[in-house]
């Protein structure tokens, strides 16, 4: 039986106070007329690959990269595969549904998710559809791959597991959601036979990997305010495991570090984070909801540096590349900072003003050893290289690694005449019936023992 540690909510109040919401958003900070020119940028190639997010901000489309191939989703349902060397189109597949997230890969399959809750597996070499299945609700976060399973949090709060070899459902757990939520969800992370997610109530939940029984509930943000917007404390940034630190961050809440084995809270700092984070050499890089960049020491939570040059410019999640921290903004600029001290090193205009929709960049940037892969909101995909002589670095990419477990070598296509019926575009607050029901947890917060062992 898995050991449980019980703790009451008041003990956490001192460090889990949520910040006030921004009812009146200031205008974006104007760009400097004479920015630093300490970064050298080269566009290696660019390719028109569909319609991007279709001008709709709730479509979190971004490329994925594996086996020298770039996989690009689009709001209109088109999926592309490009050669990393020159951007040449290898294949394209009309999935027949509105793709809404960054795909993930396993063996020879690329897993795409849609706003209608459809999961589609496509062969990475020839673009053939391998299988298709339905999730409980809209998919707004990248599917997580571990061993031969796909783990997913959908917008209705459900957490589900699917067999990556054929798309069959392994288990699904329904969870309540607040009155209003952000149009995004955090991806699950797998740790010690537990599927862990951050939910829209600002809590970390854990489920047994085999059956979906809920064993962990740790709040990292507490709602305040009178309006539904003021009470929003969604966890939408993907959790990160680095050494023995498990990092979660919430909107209008906090960024926290938990011990990966005991579940003990090591530190918590007030923050408001929506986008994914980056980690390198023991430093966590974040973009706050007001587009301030902030770096934290992973051991203590102390601030390493802050940078407010781009406040309110709707910048993307940060990435680490060649000693630089790189973000993009709503006007299609790339911005470069020294990862050691936050010094602003310059910008580069990637998209042109003639681009339709926003001509900006809002999706996740993807660093690779060949360059940074970028899908602009208008559907143009780029491979960009950048470096600065003011930055010294040991490796092109960060030292953060994602454990995908062990999977089969190949996934084969299923015989399907037509796509299965999708669910409604956006989930309501209604709790859905699922195969596995979550265990009720009321007044007491349950913090699970994260130590290794088979699930109970």
UniProtKB/Swiss-Prot annotation:
Where does lipidation (S-diacylglycerol cysteine) occur on this chain? 20
Q: Which UniProt keywords apply?
A: Cell outer membrane, Lipoprotein, Membrane, Palmitate, Signal
InterPro entries in UniProt:
BamB, PQQ_b-propeller_rpt, PQQ_rpt_dom, Quinoprotein_ADH-like_sf, WD40/YVTN_repeat-like_dom_sf
Which Gene3D superfamilies does this UniProt record tie to the protein? YVTN repeat-like/Quinoprotein amine dehydrogenase
Quick one: where's the N-palmitoyl cysteine lipidation?
A: 20
Q: Which PROSITE patterns match?
A: PROKAR_LIPOPROTEIN
Q: What coarse category fits the chief subcellular location reported for this protein?
A: membrane
Query: Per the record, GO CC terms?
Result: cell outer membrane
Family label: Belongs to the BamB family.
- Subunit annotation: Part of the Bam complex.
Q: Give the matching PANTHER family.
A: CELL SURFACE PROTEIN, OUTER MEMBRANE PROTEIN ASSEMBLY FACTOR BAMB
- In its UniProt entry, what is this protein called? Outer membrane protein assembly factor BamB
The gene is bamB
